[in-house]
Amino acid sequence: MAYSEEHKGMPCGFIRQNSGNSISLDFEPSIEYQFVERLEERYKCAFCHSVLHNPHQTGCGHRFCQHCILSLRELNTVPICPVDKEVIKSQEVFKDNCCKREVLNLYVYCSNAPGCNAKVILGRYQDHLQQCLFQPVQCSNEKCREPVLRKDLKEHLSASCQFRKEKCLYCKKDVVVINLQNHEENLCPEYPVFCPNNCAKIILKTEVDEHLAVCPEAEQDCPFKHYGCAVTDKRRNLQQHEHSALREHMRLVLEKNVQLEEQISDLHKSLEQKESKIQQLAETIKKLEKEFKQFAQLFGKNGSFLPNIQVFASHIDKSAWLEAQVHQLLQMVNQQQNKFDLRPLMEAVDTVKQKITLLENNDQRLAVLEEETNKHDTHINIHKAQLSKNEERFKLLEGTCYNGKLIWKVTDYKMKKREAVDGHTVSIFSQSFYTSRCGYRLCARAYLNGDGSGRGSHLSLYFVVMRGEFDSLLQWPFRQRVTLMLLDQSGKKNIMETFKPDPNSSSFKRPDGEMNIASGCPRFVAHSVLENAKNAYIKDDTLFLKVAVDLTDLEDL
């Protein structure tokens, strides 16, 4: 049951959509209520024996819930009244609004008794639960699953919830209370700790490394370790060690100096020997070159002297071997010189500088290329968006019906409902359909997480009159009977509501804008019924909604 934005709280069968504070007289039939006075038999369904919900009366005078009477008609070819076994004729079944008003005004106890001792009329029961201080509510803090009464929620959020956030006393960051101790001891950079060397000083975690570099209790090697001193002691004791072991340190330095001088002397001798050998090899090479020229002259005069050629070849091989030996000696000399020469290091530094310059130039080129890539990506995204719009438009045109009936396939139900719960896309529209080729243009609008009084508990379904190309030729206001349906994919229990437009409502006048204000049912079907696995309203994450317009007495242009 829903109420109009213009209705000011008076009940009616079908009313205009109200996204604000709508007033509703209805109740959830699946709840077991505790009535203040014993429930009279005339208020019980003749089929399910529970309190009547949207009562319908048959020709034999018995009353049934709307859902029950539909079930009897769908499950049986010839429905029989379970009380008097009379045949139930469809044309004799009607809504018993008088009984409905009486049922909705029956008093029931709040289910949160004994904490709450309120007595409310059945039609206002859900509204009472929305305000009842003893109603269990969900804590708004993520991961908190503790049940909380509405009256205790404020204190729970501010003082007792283990998943509320509080500022760390040291780094001032917001931290979940249950993680606060672990944050302080292991993660907080500003948490004060004792020096690990037990110097009794309290320092911040971020300053530990800096403190250890000067801590008097830190273990440190003697500065003369390079010269052979093996002493390791606390920093505060090393100065005393340096004074007391001064003579020993001087002896170690002198011994090291003597060793270095001996090594330098040996290197000089080795270099002199290598230079002498290089000189000898150079003279041998000159001699061989001279012999080579002589053999070349002989070979030029007479090429038939094979022995001379063989000797010449052997000399060539010997010359190549000598050149290799000279090359090895030169490498050894260079290695010895490099130990006392910084030129290779300077050359390496110059090479690194050149590579750094090259990398900087590459960075500039990469920045230019990245900017161009971003521009191309922007253009591509614009084209993709336009293609998506065109594709959506073609789909709508292909699926348009002109017989006053719409079958709306809603796919990805879970994802779209989650978007509605998060507030990203609270409602979705169907493709438009027409009563004829030149008839009224219409569509449906659904709130998967509910709208108005159905928010959070029901799927809300509305009927929308849209602006069409032939509106100036049509009769206004729109007067045709409309039926909204949720199709059972097993073909057994379709849920439907039918209403006749109010000619005085602006929802059915000729549209001034793209569409009129929607009209329909904010509590069309409860989530508990829609999403129940025993029912077949949702299969493969898809549901089907149907809107049918009665075309009787409607003139076709």
From Swiss-Prot:
GO molecular function terms attached to this record: identical protein binding; signaling adaptor activity; thioesterase binding; tumor necrosis factor receptor binding; ubiquitin protein ligase activity; ubiquitin protein ligase binding; zinc ion binding
Glycyl lysine isopeptide (Lys-Gly) (interchain with G-Cter in ubiquitin) cross-link site: 318
GO biological process, one term: interleukin-17-mediated signaling pathway
Expression sites (tissue/organ): Expressed in spleen, thymus, prostate, testis, ovary, small intestine, colon, and peripheral blood.
Subunit structure: Homotrimer. Heteromer with TRAF3. Associates with TNFRSF5/CD40 through interaction with TRAF3. Associates with LTBR/TNFRSF3, TNFRSF4, TNFRSF8/CD30, TNFRSF11A/RANK, TNFRSF13B/TACI, TNFRSF14, TNFRSF17, TNFRSF19/TROY, RIPK2, MAP3K14, MAP3K5, and TRAF and TNF receptor associated protein TDP2. Interacts (via C-terminus) with EIF2AK2/PKR (via the kinase catalytic domain).
Biological role: Adapter protein and signal transducer that links members of the tumor necrosis factor receptor family to different signaling pathways by association with the receptor cytoplasmic domain and kinases. Mediates activation of NF-kappa-B and probably JNK. Seems to be involved in apoptosis. Plays a role in mediating activation of NF-kappa-B by EIF2AK2/PKR.
Family: Belongs to the TNF receptor-associated factor family. A subfamily.
The protein's name in its UniProt record: TNF receptor-associated factor 5
Species this chain originates from: Homo sapiens
